[in-house]
Each structure stands twice: as structure tokens, then as C-alpha cells.
């Protein structure tokens, strides 16, 4: 990384402070990547976790407003607090099921819900959730 010369009279940052700042930026960020058994990819940067799910499923009779557990996360990917986010859940005809969401419990269970008013058959789940891991 090239160092930028800010010594132009408009900055109050001295050269030693700037060099320290620049060198810290130049350090490589440690990114851990993991793909679980259902093909969901997790990226962990420090404690920040990005979960990206594109799961083709065959889930029959997903009840209205009842949790369905997809998987349980390894401890290092579990959130510090309950995480709830939007999920695109499609039925067997690949039509969107309205009012669908996903949650990740602090115990690691990844659950989906649908609130369409009736029982649905699920064919696909798409979701991206970003959260802070407990550790």
C-alpha cells in the first residue's frame, strides 16, 4: 500500500501517527469462511458474522407461525443476542410465501417462520443476515 503524504499543512496528524495508522490499515483482515451441511456460507471477520443462505429444500407442511429448525450453528458462529431478519421463502411453485422470516437463537438454532395464514410446502429459502457473534 502506498503511503499518502498528508504533510501539506491542512492536517494536524503528525508523521509518526499517520505511519502507525497507515500500517494498521495495511494489515490483512483475518476472514474465516465456513459452509455448513445445508450449503449456507458464513464469513466471520472478528466478531462480525455474515450468513448467506441459498438453500433448495423440500419441507412439507410448514405450519403457519411455527418455528422450523434448519440447522444448529457451531458455537463460534452463534450470536450474542437473538437475530431476526427477512427471508425469501418460496413454495413448491416457486412463488413467494408472504411474511416469511428467519431467526438465529443464541443457542445456535437457525429457524424459519412463515405467516401466510396457512400451511405451506417450502422449496427454496434465500436469506442474508449480518450479526455480532457472542465470542
Please identify what each model-predicted range represents.
Residues 54-56, 75-78:
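Solvent-exposed strand-to-loop "edge" motifs in beta-rich extracellular domains
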Residues 23-31, 78-87:
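Short, hydrophobic/aromatic-rich segments at coil-to-beta transitions
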Residues 18, 42, 49-51, 73:
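Extracellular/surface recognition and adhesion modules
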Residues 38-44:
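Short amphipathic beta-strand and strand-loop transition segments with alternating hydrophobic
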Residues 36, 61-72, 80-135:
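Extracellular jelly-roll beta-sandwich "head" domains, especially the C-terminal globular C1q domain
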Residues 1-30:
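N-terminal low-complexity, intrinsically disordered "leader/linker" segments enriched in small/polar
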Residues 47-57:
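Short, well-ordered beta-strand segments enriched in hydrophobic/aromatic residues
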Amino acid at each position: 500500500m502506498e503511503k499518502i503524504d498528508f504533510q501539506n499543512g491542512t492536517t494536524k496528524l503528525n508523521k509518526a501517527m499517520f505511519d502507525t495508522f497507515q500500517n494498521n490499515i495495511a494489515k490483512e483482515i483475518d476472514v474465516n469462511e465456513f459452509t455448513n451441511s445445508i450449503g449456507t456460507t458464513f464469513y466471520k471477520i472478528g466478531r462480525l458474522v455474515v450468513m448467506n443462505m441459498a438453500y433448495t429444500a423440500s419441507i412439507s407442511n410448514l405450519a403457519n407461525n411455527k418455528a422450523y429448525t434448519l440447522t444448529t450453528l457451531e458455537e463460534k458462529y452463534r450470536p450474542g443476542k437473538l437475530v431476526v431478519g427477512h427471508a425469501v421463502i418460496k413454495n413448491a411453485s416457486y412463488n413467494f410465501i408472504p411474511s416469511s422470516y428467519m431467526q438465529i437463537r443464541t443457542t445456535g438454532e437457525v429457524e424459519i417462520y412463515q405467516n401466510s395464514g396457512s400451511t405451506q410446502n417450502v422449496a427454496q429459502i434465500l436469506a442474508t443476515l449480518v450479526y455480532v457473534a457472542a465470542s
